[in-house]
């Protein structure tokens, strides 16, 4: 490192993306600092992935042990199940503390300098850190922006963080309302509906688009609606906006038809979770000091090497990863982007393969996917001149699923008819989040279903649902 610089790399934001980048940078021999103004670990560790999975694990056990029909099929009888909200909430909070501590310690152990305060770009290769007691200026050969995202709250919604709240508050599980409305049917809304119904709450789900779960493959969404929504007596509204939400007791929700814009109903519920997506936290980053502007939604434009783009060209020595780029708002995607950015900083040209990054909803049963949906693949096929085919298998034909008495589910693979290249995989079923990685690796390696059909899977395992899907594709 030149004496003109304090660090080879300064990272703004110690979420999963920044943390992953910092660890890889140190392994590559870069003197690295990471700046964080709030909680180490960012959204994932403190208000997202980690606490929500703890809640899902606990509530999932309650659901499983409360399902007398399922238990009797296995020859098990339990005389009632009890739980305490406070203990489940404490489990989530304790896990957050542990992961946050582990993350911080890993940075210290590898000699990454952790600097507390608000970090912002103050010029080319320069970062200003505004702390409680001092302001520092750091010179860095490379700067990486990892500011993350925050929940999006549409206009007309009054948030009081008690009766009307976002996922930031929901993960604390401070109350179990008798009746809760959830605005949005994406993975956040789905996961919290899973938690709340398992713990005895009545749920109403409101979706602005015509169909529930619009981000999932339609066949998967149809099964999910049957298994995760209808079987749990969740009331649903589709094609409807929650145009006004007034916090209080009760919470008042005005519903408006998305097409006609007419008010169609008013709900009075005990609480409301607003799960309408997330927006980038890109304000006050000092981007203007290097002539960079965010797009109209606030995202930082980057290329697949994670270089910040201005007027179609990379900005020297400036990188961005994670939710703030708008590419794929997932913690593991951010971590992968961070590693790719560091590789490029070190002169090893690398690009992010977004098609091979999997995603999952940790409902009961789980949903996972990687690559293209059937519709997306067909659209690509029309452009590039190839035909798309699909193959499906059902968990009800899988020996391990039958042994578990967990037979709701399907695995669907999407592939090119000419070359057999796997383009996408979509699963709903027990342990779907674990099963999808096999397909993700196959997509990353551009494998053909004709090759995959000859791979031997252990028997009896759930992984055979993909094995059977590959074989049906040949």
UniProtKB/Swiss-Prot annotation:
Keyword Flavoprotein: yes
Cofactor: FAD
Short name of one Pfam family: Pyr_redox_dim
Major location (coarse): membrane
Bound cofactor: record note: Binds 1 FAD per subunit.
Catalytic activity: N(6)-[(R)-dihydrolipoyl]-L-lysyl-[protein] + NAD(+) = N(6)-[(R)-lipoyl]-L-lysyl-[protein] + NADH + H(+)
Protein family according to the UniProt entry: Belongs to the class-I pyridine nucleotide-disulfide oxidoreductase family.
Subunit note: Homodimer.
Entry protein name: Dihydrolipoyl dehydrogenase
Source organism per UniProt: Synechocystis sp. (strain ATCC 27184 / PCC 6803 / Kazusa)
């Amino acid at each position: 490192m030149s004496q003109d610089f304090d660090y080879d790399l300064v990272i703004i934001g110690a979420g999963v993306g920044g943390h992953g980048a910092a660890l890889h940078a140190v392994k590559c021999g870069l003197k690295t600092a990471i700046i964080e103004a709030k909680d180490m670990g960012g959204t994932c560790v403190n208000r997202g992935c980690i606490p929500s999975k703890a809640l899902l694990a606990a509530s999932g056990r309650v659901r499983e042990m409360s399902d007398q029909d399922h238990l009797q099929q296995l020859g098990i009888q339990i005389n009632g199940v009890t739980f305490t909200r406070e203990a489940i909430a404490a489990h989530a909070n304790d896990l957050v503390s542990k992961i946050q501590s582990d993350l911080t310690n890993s940075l210290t152990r590898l000699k990454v300098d952790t600097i507390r305060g608000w970090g912002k770009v103050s010029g080319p290769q320069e970062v200003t850190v505004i702390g409680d007691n001092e302001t520092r200026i750091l010179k860095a050969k490379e700067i990486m922006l990892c500011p993350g995202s925050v929940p999006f709250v549409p206009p007309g919604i009054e948030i009081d963080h008690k009766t009307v709240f976002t996922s930031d508050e929901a993960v604390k599980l401070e109350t179990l309302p008798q009746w809760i409305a959830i605005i949005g049917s994406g993975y956040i809304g789905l996961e919290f509906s899973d938690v709340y119904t398992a713990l005895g709450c009545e749920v109403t789900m409101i979706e602005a688009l015509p169909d529930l779960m619009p981000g999932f493959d339609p066949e998967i969404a149809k099964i999910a609606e049957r298994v995760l929504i209808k079987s749990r007596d969740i009331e649903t509204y589709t094609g409807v906006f929650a145009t006004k939400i007034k916090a209080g007791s009760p919470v008042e929700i005005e519903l408006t038809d998305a097409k006609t814009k007419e008010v169609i109903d008013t709900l009075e519920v005990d609480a409301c979770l607003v799960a309408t997506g997330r927006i980038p936290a890109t304000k006050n980053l000092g981007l203007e000091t290097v002539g960079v502007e965010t797009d109209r939604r606030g995202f930082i434009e980057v290329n697949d090497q994670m270089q910040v783009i201005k007027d179609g060209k990379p900005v020297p020595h400036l990188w961005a990863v994670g939710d703030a780029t708008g590419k794929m708002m997932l913690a593991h995607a951010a971590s992968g982007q961070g590693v790719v950015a560091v590789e490029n900083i070190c002169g090893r040209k690398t690009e992010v393969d977004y098609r091979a990054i999997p995603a999952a909803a940790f409902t009961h049963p789980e949903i996972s996917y990687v690559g293209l949906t059937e519709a997306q693949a067909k659209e690509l096929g029309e452009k590039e001149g190839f035909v798309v085919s699909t193959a499906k298998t059902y968990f009800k034909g899988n020996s391990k699923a039958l042994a578990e008495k967990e037979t709701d589910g399907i695995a669907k693979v999407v592939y090119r008819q000419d070359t057999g290249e796997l383009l996408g995989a979509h699963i709903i079923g027990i342990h779907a989040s674990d099963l999808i990685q096999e397909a993700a690796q196959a997509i990353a390696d551009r494998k053909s279903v004709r090759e995959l059909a000859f791979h031997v899977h252990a028997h009896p395992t759930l992984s055979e649902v993909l094995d059977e899907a590959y074989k049906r594709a040949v």
